[in-house]
Structures are given as C-alpha cells and as structure tokens.
Amino acid sequence: MVTSDVGNDKLRSAHRRAMPKELLDSMNVIRIFLLAKIPPHEKSIEQNVIEEESRTFGDILQGSFWEHYRYLPIKALMGLQWAAINYDKASYIVKVDDDTAFSLEGTFKLLTNMKVKGDFFMGYILNNTEPVRDNRTKWYVSREEYAKDEFPPYLSGGFYVTTPNTARRVIKEAKNHPYFFLEDLFVTGFMTQVLNIKLIQLPKGFWLHYYELLKCCIDDMIFKRIMCDAIVGLPPDDGENDLIVTFNDAIRSCQNCSARTKEEALDKVCEAYVKVKHTLGEKYY
C-alpha cells in the first residue's frame, strides 16, 4: 500500500512504470494507492481527474477525510484495514510513501529468506528520538500532545512491513487510543508498545537513509557494475518523481554485476555522503 498525496499523480505514475501490473500479477501482489479528499483551498486538482485515474488503473482507495499531514495516521490505518479485510490470507503488508524508492523483488527475496513469524513491524528503527518543540515546523509536538522528552522506539514511515493479523490488532487498539498526528510514531511506536508487538530492524545495508547514498548506489550499478544491496532509499529534500523508476531499472540491468566488497562500502566511498557527513558531524549519520 502506497500513501500518496492526492495531487501526486506523477509519483503514482512512476510506481506503475517501475512495477507494472504484469509484474505484480506474476508475484501475486496487490498494490493500492491511499488518497484523501482534495482540500477546499486546492484549485489545481479536480476530483473527476482522480476518479478517471481510479477507473483507468483500479488501484486507488480515497478516504473521506481531507488531505493533510496531520491526518496521515488515518490514511495509514485506512490502508491497513482495507488490506486486512480484503486480503486476510496475504503473507505480508508493505507500506511505502509515494516518494520512497524501493525494490519489490528485493523486498520479496528478503522476506522469503528471513521467514519472520508472529506479529511484527519491520523497517528502519528509530531509537531515542525527541519531540520537536519548535512550533514553526510541521513536526511540532506540544507538551499537551506528548509530555515526555523521548519517544518510544518506532519505524521510519517511508517503508515498513507487517502482516494482516498485526494490522487487525493495531486497528482495534487505535480506536481506543488518543489520536497522535505523527503516522509512523502512532502506528509503529505507540501501538506496538501497547500491544507488545516486536519491531524488526532491516538488515544493515538494505536501507539507505540518505539520498546521497542512494544516488551513489544507483551510479555504481550503472557505471561501475557493482550491485546495490539496498531495497529501500529515501528521496532528496526537493523530491524526484522518477527516482523509483531509475532505482528499479538500475537493479534489473545489474543482475550480473559484482558484489560490493568491504573496501567499497558505500559510507566509505560515496564522496557526496562523506562530504555532507563531515560538514554536519554526528547530526548526519
């Protein structure tokens, strides 16, 4: 399931090109884009266009709430409920943001090899994070919303994996829990803490938390013929509509590439990453 802003038609198009329906069918995978209502102030998007997109591709689920950052938990829970009800026999539910680059084949291979059992959420675990108290940002959390100085462990919301049974438990608990607007924290932090659901860290190297690393990984596949182990990468701050297409095309054209050696570790040889890390110090890790 792909959380997508109602106006991000170019990103949805990129997902469909990177992973066309024929590929999804061959892997027994269902994809759904999760949208909300067009905000009243938004004049550049028309509902009839969204409905036409839905009729054409049959892969859109649109909620009755407004499209807004603070409603992302509702959107994620809507998707989890839809998946748990309609595909209760599915092995896994994968949630991604529409601007996240990921490899479906790589994710499938990883899950097959790991053979995870029981209720879980798997992704990039964030530990010891603190609430943002700067009211000028969209991540601002007031003391009334959350009084403690540290959040419980949770997963980055750009990509995570769970199961239908886990989703059902979370949906049931969410109805009885005070609402919190940070989707990844609410779903994979507060809910998992209350329900004692385990968080699983993606193996090292499978998640590229900074765009500089993803760009180097893609370039190495194209120009140096070195395989990229990552299955997930995050976009640049200013976005890149076709990033998921570029990433998947590079992976598929690199099936016979050489494996990356320890001496070629991305965090050592990626000059753009090393430069920015040196500039920002420990804040950039």
Enumerate the predicted regions with their spans.
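Secretory-pathway lumenal glyco-enzymes, predominantly type II signal-anchor Golgi glycosyltransferases
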Residues: 1-285
